[in-house]
C-alpha cells in the first residue's frame, strides 16, 4: 500500500489539461485557472472519511432519457438489486451520518444502503443532479435532433456547454463546492453521501482541486462507491485530501459498459503487483534497497487478479523489470494463455509481454534512500523530479504502444508495477503536475482501469482506482474499523 505522510503533504496548486492530440510524443499542457479547489476554504479537526455512492439504475437510465435534476424516474428492479449489493458491501462499515439528495432515485438508494442504522439521514437539495433545463426528459436521440449544436457541445465540450442562458457544469461545480463545508462541519468521522453521477463527479473534483474541464474524467457508475480522506494538518491549515478509491462497483469494473456514454475503444489496466517480502502496509519499507520477490500474500494477490482478468482477453502485458512485477505479470499471462486453450474453441491465446525500464521507480528511490524507510514526499527535489520524469516517459511509451497501427480496436493492455508507479501514471493520464501525487492512494494487489473512448491519442477516463474486491477475504474494507 502506498500513501504519503502528513508532515509534508503534496497538494495540487494547479491542475493541467492536455490537448486531445499528442504532437511528436510530447503533450502540450494548458493551465486551468480554476477556483474549484477547497484547500483554502475549510479545516478539519480530526480525520474524516467521506464515502460517495451514486444511486442505482433508474427507469430513465434504462430508457436512455436525460434526467438532470428532474424527479420523475425511480429505481428499477436492477437498481434496487444494485443498492442491495452496495448495502451488503457496506454492511460492516461504520458511518456516523448519511447525506443524500432528496430526489426519489437517490433517496431510495440511500434508504436501502442505510438499512436499520439509527444514525440520522440528512436530505440536502444541493446534492441533486446537474440542472439540464430544456434537455431534461428527452431521449438522447431527441436531444441531438432538437438541439443540434448545443447537444454536440454537451457531448464534446461540457465545461462550456450553455443552454437556456445557463452553464450547467459551471453551476454544478459551484454547487458541489458549497456542499463541502456542511458535510465536513458535521461532528462525524465517517460520512456516507448518496447522490448522482454528475454531482458526485463534481464533489470529487472540487475536493481534490480539479476544474470543470475534468467533467466525465472520473467515472461514476450506478451504485459505484468512491472514498475521500480529509486529514488535518499539524499546523491547523487546510486538510490533506486523498482519493482513496474511485468507483468501486457492485459488479466487476471489467464487466464493460460505457465511459461517459461512450464505449471504450481501448483500455489500460494498472495492476499493483502482489505484496513483496518486507513490505509494510503504509510505507515502502526497504523496497529501495531490495529487488523483492513476492511473499505468499503477494502470490495470492496475483492469482486473484489473474482470475479477475479472465473477464477480458488481454492483448499485452507491460511490467516493471523488478522481480515482484515480473512474477505478477507471469501469473497473469499464464492464466490468460491457459484459459484460451480451455475455451470452447480451444484456440491458443498468446499474450505479448515486455519489461519497461521506465516503470521501475525503485531505482530512483534507492538513489535517495538513507534510512531504508522511504516515503515518496521525503525524496529530495532531484529524485522526486527524476521519478516524475520517468513516469512521463513511461506514459508516453504506453500510449505509443496502444496507438500502434497494428494494434486492434478494443485492445487491452495490462501494466504491472508498484503502487507509486501507478499513482504517477494516473496523474499523467489526468495531465496533472508532480505535486498531485499525494492525491491518490493504491494498495498492493489493487487494479485501476483507464478507458480511452476516443482512442489513446485523446483524453483518458479513469473508470476506477484501487479496486480490491476481487481479493476476497484479503480485500481492503471501504471504511476504517470503528
Swiss-Prot record:
Residues 1-34 form a transit peptide. Pfam families: His_Phos_1. InterPro entries: His_Pase_superF_clade-1, His_PPase_superfam, PG/BPGM_mutase_AS, PGM_Phosphatase. The active site is at residues 55, 129. It is found in: Plastid, Chloroplast stroma. GO terms for cellular component: chloroplast; chloroplast stroma. One of its GO terms (molecular function) is 2-carboxy-D-arabinitol-1-phosphatase activity. Phosphoglycerate mutase-like protein lacking PGM activity, but having 2-carboxy-D-arabinitol 1-phosphate (CA1P) phosphatase activity. Prevents the accumulation of D-glycero-2,3-pentodiulose-1,5-bisphosphate (PDBP) a potent inhibitor of ribulose-1,5-bisphosphate carboxylase (RuBisCO). PDBP is produced during the oxidation of ribulose-1,5-bisphosphate, the substrate of RuBisCO. This is Probable 2-carboxy-D-arabinitol-1-phosphatase. The lineage of its organism: Eukaryota, Viridiplantae, Streptophyta, Embryophyta, Tracheophyta.
Amino acid at each position: 500500500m502506498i500513501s504519503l505522510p502528513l508532515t509534508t503533504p503534496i497538494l495540487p496548486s494547479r491542475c493541467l489539461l492536455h490537448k486531445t492530440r499528442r504532437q511528436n510524443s510530447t503533450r502540450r499542457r494548458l493551465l486551468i485557472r480554476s477556483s474549484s479547489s477547497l484547500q483554502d476554504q475549510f479545516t478539519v479537526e480530526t480525520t474524516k472519511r467521506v464515502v460517495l455512492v451514486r444511486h442505482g439504475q433508474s427507469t430513465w437510465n434504462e430508457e436512455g432519457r436525460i434526467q438532470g435534476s428532474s424527479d420523475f424516474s425511480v429505481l428499477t428492479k436492477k437498481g434496487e438489486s444494485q443498492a442491495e449489493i452496495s448495502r451488503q458491501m457496506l454492511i460492516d462499515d461504520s458511518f456516523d451520518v448519511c447525506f443524500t439528495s432528496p430526489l426519489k432515485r437517490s433517496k431510495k438508494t440511500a434508504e436501502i444502503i442505510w438499512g436499520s442504522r439509527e444514525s440520522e439521514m440528512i436530505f440536502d437539495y444541493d446534492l441533486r443532479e446537474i440542472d439540464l433545463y430544456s434537455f431534461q426528459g428527452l431521449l438522447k436521440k431527441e436531444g441531438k435532433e432538437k438541439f443540434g449544436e448545443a447537444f454536440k457541445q454537451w457531448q464534446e465540450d461540457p465545461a462550456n456547454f450553455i443552454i437556456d442562458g445557463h452553464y450547467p457544469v459551471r453551476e454544478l461545480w459551484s454547487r458541489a463546492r458549497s456542499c463541502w463545508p456542511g458535510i465536513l462541519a458535521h461532528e462525524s468521522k465517517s460520512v456516507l453521501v448518496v447522490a448522482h453521477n454528475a454531482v458526485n463527479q463534481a464533489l470529487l473534483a472540487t475536493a481534490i482541486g480539479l476544474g470543470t474541464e475534468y467533467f466525465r474524467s472520473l467515472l461514476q457508475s450506478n451504485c459505484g462507491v468512491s472514498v475521500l480522506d480529509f486529514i488535518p494538518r499539524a499546523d491547523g491549515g487546510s486538510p490533506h485530501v486523498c482519493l482513496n478509491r474511485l468507483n468501486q462497483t457492485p459488479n466487476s469494473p471489467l464487466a464493460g459498459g460505457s465511459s461517459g456514454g461512450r464505449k471504450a475503444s481501448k483500455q489500460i489496466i494498472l495492476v499493483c503487483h502482489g505484496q513483496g517480502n518486507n513490505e509494510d502496509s503504509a510505507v515502502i519499507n526497504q523496497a529501495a534497497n531490495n529487488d523483492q520477490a513476492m511473499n505468499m500474500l503477494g502470490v495470492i494477490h496475483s492469482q486473484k487478479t489473474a482470475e479477475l482478468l479472465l473477464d477480458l482477453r488481454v492483448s499485452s502485458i507491460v511490467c516493471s523489470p523488478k522481480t515482484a512485477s515480473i512474477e505478477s505479470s507471469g501469473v497473469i499471462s499464464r492464466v490468460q494463455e491457459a484459459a484460451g486453450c480451455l475455451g470452447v474453441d480451444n484456440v491458443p491465446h498468446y499474450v505479448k509481454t515486455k519489461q519497461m525500464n521506465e516503470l521501475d521507480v525503485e531505482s530512483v528511490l534507492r538513489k535517495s534512500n538513507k534510512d531504508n524507510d522511504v516515503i515518496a514526499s521525503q525524496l529530495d527535489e532531484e529524485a522526486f523530479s527524476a521519478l516524475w520524469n520517468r513516469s512521463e516517459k513511461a506514459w508516453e511509451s504506453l500510449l505509443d504502444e496502444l496507438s500502434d497501427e497494428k494494434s486492434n480496436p478494443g485492445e487491452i493492455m495490462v501494466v504491472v508495477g508498484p503502487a507509486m508507479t501507478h499513482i504517477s501514471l494516473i496523474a499523467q493520464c489526468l495531465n496533472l503536475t508532480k505535486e498531485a501525487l499525494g492525491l491518490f492512494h493504491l494498495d498492493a494487489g489493487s487494479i485501476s482501469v483507464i478507458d480511452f473512448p476516443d482512442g489513446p491519442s485523446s483524453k483518458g477516463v479513469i473508470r476506477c482506482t484501487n479496486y480490491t474486491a476481487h481479493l476476497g477475504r484479503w480485500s481492503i474494507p471501504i471504511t476504517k474499523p470503528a
